[in-house]
């Protein structure tokens, strides 16, 4: 299987480079790809390469050529060499870099335009456009959804980790109404205690015990029934919020959800929402939550893309690759619309652009996505 994998990669690179040399004319759109084709993240790089092969087949224009170059991992020398090689090959627009950490290095190449799958900064930044699903787009989609559900007291929860300052800067710039912030430790053992304070768990539990004592010595039917009802409860009284946005993912997200349920937050009264979910089915096995809502790319298109990718390459793609697929379509659209691509301003479209992941807006020097709201229920992803 491994030899077959490398054979396919060789074939794609051969086709890309053969097209490059056979289309030496001004009508050719040469698009660079900066990707880790070697090193610990080579699987992602090769997956990006596969994705662009699919996009090329759908575009079906022999005047579009991909020029892939290896950047390795965290390798400034390789990245510089790759970019210089692209420039000498007539590339004007580049898909990449894949990580925000490399932005400072590519900004100095003012003669090139970079379309990055990163989601860290949706603003047009010098010569870089990031088309990843940004935190801003997700928060705006969620706050609109929460408003539609007539919730007015939202807690935005996020961990005290390396992204703390980044998240707080984004929240400050958005100035979201009817929200308050709550930060927590990524350590599950500390987290539960912090959630207990947030939910006033100790007082609510004490209130229940005091209430039960009022009926323990009474023998009338009404008191007996009330005591039976109270025995079914874990706490008494509600919390002072009606919705939560959890900016976390993976096991950390599951720990937060578990702690909220442990502290007896009523799921019928409080709306649970989160971000950064690429239809991760492991969330199905988080039995504590009945309904979890989140904004995301178009699920049907995402499934179609994954199936098409698997049919051709017999492996499933990394999630980020669908962004590269859309990036090539976006570049091709700009090229066909303008006749050529001269600057980053050629991507300031008046109308919204529909891609595989959803609909993009490129206004006021910023990329935003119109995201759908999904919920996990009965081990399914359901569009709300």
Model region roles, listed by residue range:
Residues 3-13, 20-384:
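Extracytosolic ligand-binding ectodomains
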